[in-house]
Amino acid sequence: MKKPFHPLIFLALGLLLGEHAMATEEPKFEILSQQGGIELRRYPAFIVAETTVEGDMDAASNKGFRAIADYIFGNNQSALAAPSPGSEKIAMTAPVTMEPVAPAAQKIAMTAPVAIEPLASAATDAPATSSLQNAKRWRVHFVMPSQYTLASLPKPNNAAVQLRQVPAKTWAVLGYSGFNTESRVQQKTDELMAWLQAQKIQSLGNPQLARYNPPWTLPMFRRNEVMIEIQQP
C-alpha cells in the first residue's frame, strides 16, 4: 500500500526551491527609507539583456523569458574568444522584469529583476502611466551579472535580444507574494501610486513588475515587486 504524500513535504520542497532561487545574484541597492511594505531604494547602474514581444502579460512573459534564456544559456558569441568567438554561458540572476510598451515605442525603460512598465506613447516626452492592464506589447529584461561590462558580455546571436546599461535611479518598491494576474498587479500598482501621492513624492517613470522566483515556486513563497522610478528625496 502506498503511503500518502504528506502536505508538509510539499511545503518543505517549495521552501527549498524558493531559497535556491534567492541564491542567484541580484542588483545591489541602498534602502533610503521604509514604511510598511514600501521601500525607497537607490540602485547603481547595471546592465540588462532585453527583448520586445507581443501578447498578453503571461504570453509575453513566456516568450521574452525564452528568448533571453536562450541568450544566456549559450546562443551568443563570446567577447573573450576573438577572432573566432565561441559561445559562453551566463549565470542566471534575479529579478526578471517586464514592461508594457506602446506599439511604436522605441524608448527603453529600466528593470530590476522579470518586470513590467507601461509606456503611454511613442513620444519621448509622453507622461507616465500607471496602467499595466490590457497591454499587448512588452519589453522583458534580465539583469546581467555584475562581473560583466557591455564590452565583455557575449554578443547575442538573436538580433531581437539587446544589451543596455541602465543608469543609477531611485525607486519606490512595493513587495508582495502570490500569483501575478493583470488585475492583481494593477491593484498593487494603484496602491503604490496612492502612497507616493500621499507622501508628495514625484514619480518619474512608468511602473514595472519584478519577479524573483522560478515558475514552480509555491505562491506563498514567491517574491514579487511593483517598482516606480521617483525623484530622489
Description of each model-found segment:
Residues K2-P233:
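A solvent-exposed interaction/effector surface
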